[in-house]
Amino acid sequence: MKRRHTRREFCATAAATMLASALPAPYVLAADKKYSPGASDTEIKLGQTVPHSGPGSLYGVLGRVGEAYFQMLNDKGGINGRKITFLTLDDAYSAPKCVEATRRLVEQEEVLALYGSLGTAPQTAVHKYLNSKGVPQLLLNTGASKWNDPTNYKWTMAGLPLYPTEARILAKHVVKVKPDAKIGILYQNDDFGRDFLLPFKQVLADAGGRAKVIMEQTYDLTDPTVDSQLINLSKSGADVFYNITTGKASSQSIRKVAELGWKPLQLLSAGSTGRSILNAAGFENAAGIVAIRFAKDAGVPRWQNDPDVMGFEELRKAYLPTVEPDNTIAFAGYGEVVTMAEILRRCGDELTRENVLKQATGLHGFHSPFFLDGVTYSYTPDDYTPMKTLYISIFNGKDWDISDQPVSE
């Protein structure tokens, strides 16, 4: 959605009761209050960059949910007595704009930390900068493998399953169910796409090479459609289609496969399994798609009585009435902001960037309200893998049938 403003500021305070989904965790007790830039006796300032405009604007709702949640907390009380000022800036999924917005957050606004920013390419552009400044870059909406490098880039942590983990699991699934598969792949022409592609192909090679990739097609985020790529793939003889796309390209490609009458086994990257994306493609067109799952869906009968989904729905009705109940991207944003609030709660009166990082790396075992039962964060100070418990799932035309047992790479 086109946005006129790139900065919005909300002040918020939190009551501990609003974090009902959080696992118990001790507060940091300190003889003296300690602060980094962005924190004081009365305020905690956070930042974020997401595409509120441009080709990735579908994901701008992540920032809107963050605003709403902090506003709700503001109306309730306080995270250890402090208000939250949250600045979500528009980077239009552009690396140069992300650099500009991030520098503004750090150098002008002096935020304590950034959380929930989106996109492998934009976040790569500010990766070294934020680490050189010692500013936490947490719960990134990207699962690039580079974010798991606590030795060299300790200030950066992914918030999604790492893409290579997901790709390896899907490759093993293909080898198991179609050992002689002929695979066509459509992938985003950037680090995001390649982070899936290479480990997927490596698993096929390690399995003996009977299942093999016979055609690869790429697309750029600025491409108006992916129709020509899908036509090429459909004519290639491929009987498996690995769809490594995001946003509107995911919806377009699923719909185009159906229009072409092509009937491959379809694999879809987990970040594109939300109901808003599938609804745009047509649920009937998405039937049979296989994907990795780690999270619940909002707005579906299966989860309507789930306490976490009910918490999101309460927020949505009160603060985000224009957001659809089944917007899984918005629900993901809810899980992230609840987690960020938990990190701040654990910091107590030691609101330094070092302690924010310490509490984030200590989230092992914390269950985000977005996660499926049994899935928790697996972060440790030495391993920033966000989660290691994942599930294979198949879309049945209405909902996801999720495997009984978790899988790993």
Spans of model-derived segments:
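Segments of small-molecule ligand-sensing domains
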Residues: 318-331, 339-400
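Extracellular/periplasmic periplasmic-binding protein-like sensory domains
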Residues: 254-333, 402-408
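Beta-alpha junction/loop-to-helix N-cap segments that form part of ligand/metal-binding clefts
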Residues: 32-34, 58-64, 76-149, 159, ...
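N-terminal secretory signal peptides
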Residues: 1-29
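Extracytoplasmic ligand/sensor domains, especially the bilobed periplasmic-binding protein
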Residues: 110-216, 266-294
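Extracytoplasmic "Venus flytrap"
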Residues: 35-40, 47-66, 89-96, 118-119, ...
